[in-house]
Amino acid sequence: MSYLVPMVIEQTNRGERSYDIYSRLLKDRIIFLGGPVTDDVANLVVAQMLFLEAEDPEKDIFLYINSPGGSISAGMAIYDTMQYIRADVHTICVGLAASMGAFLLTAGAKGKRQALPNAEILIHQPLIGGGGISGQATEIEIHAKHLLRVKERMNRILAERTGQTIERIEADTDRDRYMTAEEAKEYGLIDEVLEKPNQPKK
């Protein structure tokens, strides 16, 4: 099901200009990752990061995440780009950051990984997509070995990003592990739970 993307109108000294909401947010260095992490989505996110990096490598990029996860290779393309560019990527979870969504949430710059109070974070081991594996025994063995290598690499990165031991990460990702925003902070997946900003006194 497709949704209508809202348009916003901005007044400039040259008259009115209309943007779709995501393009307008991009002007403020905000990227929104909403939905599954697919190759197409990853390409868009990477392209936006590279554009913002070229515009100003000293300014933070804000990546808002509300995602059930998705493709490992697509997610790793986003992860590697986040580490490659000079601009700090500030990650914020709104709603849900599950699986690869949680991995990208914790990949933000240290001290700049946040979640809203009612957000949920889910970590687990890498899954095989497509409803199962079929093929020759040797091909299944190749896929299984590859998945174990991917699992080991992702666990190592999670351990580095959270400060947890590899053994703890392996145990906690063996099955689905849901966390509240506060629990994710205690675990080291994020640095801060965002509360309402201070309101000016009347």
From Swiss-Prot:
Active-site residues from the entry: 99 (nucleophile), 124
Keyword Cytoplasm attributed: yes
GO MF terms, alphabetically ordered: ATP-dependent peptidase activity; ATPase binding; serine-type endopeptidase activity
Protein's cellular compartments: Cytoplasm
Record field: catalytic activity: Hydrolysis of proteins to small peptides in the presence of ATP and magnesium. alpha-casein is the usual test substrate. In the absence of ATP, only oligopeptides shorter than five residues are hydrolyzed (such as succinyl-Leu-Tyr-|-NHMec, and Leu-Tyr-Leu-|-Tyr-Trp, in which cleavage of the -Tyr-|-Leu- and -Tyr-|-Trp bonds also occurs)
Main location: cytoplasm
Keywords: Cytoplasm, Hydrolase, Protease, Serine protease
GO BP field: protein quality control for misfolded or incompletely synthesized proteins
InterPro entries: ClpP, ClpP/crotonase-like_dom_sf, ClpP/TepA, ClpP_His_AS, ClpP_Ser_AS
EC number of the protein: 3.4.21.92
Pfam families: CLP_protease
Any single GO CC term annotated in Swiss-Prot or TrEMBL for this entry: cytoplasm
PROSITE patterns (alphabetical): CLP_PROTEASE_HIS, CLP_PROTEASE_SER
Assembly information from the UniProt record: Fourteen ClpP subunits assemble into 2 heptameric rings which stack back to back to give a disk-like structure with a central cavity, resembling the structure of eukaryotic proteasomes.
Record HAMAP family: ClpP
Protein family membership: Belongs to the peptidase S14 family.
UniProt xrefs under NCBIfam families: clpP, PRK00277.1, PRK12553.1
Record-linked PANTHER family: ATP-DEPENDENT CLP PROTEASE PROTEOLYTIC SUBUNIT
Stated role: Cleaves peptides in various proteins in a process that requires ATP hydrolysis. Has a chymotrypsin-like activity. Plays a major role in the degradation of misfolded proteins.
This protein's name: ATP-dependent Clp protease proteolytic subunit 2
Gene it is expressed from: clpP2
